[in-house]
Amino acid sequence: IMNGGKTLWLVDVVKAGMDSLYNETGTILAAQRELNLTDMLFKYGIRINPLLVKDEYATPIKLASGNQGSETQMQEYTWKFSPFIYPTSTNPIVKNMEGIKFEFASPIEILKKDIKKTVLLSSSEYSKTVGTPSPISLDMVTEETTPEEYEGKGLLPVAVLMEGKFNSMYKNRVLPFKDNTFQASGKDNKMIV
């Protein structure tokens, strides 16, 4: 980062996955995953909150809904923890892209720092967050919702471009030994979280 290398961060701050859901109970406990990146990203002006985005505009999953003879009947259900996000930004990185499927996405909070930030992708206006730790069950596909549940909660950033001169995480810290290659501040750079 200090030498000008561009960075793409694909970070899961919540431990949850579809493969874990396909167990005997169809339930998992979504919990925070500590990655030790919080301080660095906070210094650069963003915070990935340990929450899950639940969106009405989501991709379907197929679940067994019964049997017809010896054949298992499969039915598609909307899985609200897998938002299907259409880019609305005019930034060249996402301009003209089709919908993008996320699984167990976490919202990004934008903080006031010197680094320029551009929201590349955000959830729909019919989305909200679910705190962690929280049980997630396949039975949630049958939940009924109303637009009032999402009022004022949507449009959550899930991808952000940061541009500028990033300071080292170790700036103003005592180094264990003298390092002639240490840079307190980097060159103009970009990173996507």
Give the label of every model feature segment.
Residues I1-V193:
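Acidic, S/T/G-rich, low-cysteine, solvent-exposed domains in lumenal/extracellular/periplasmic regions
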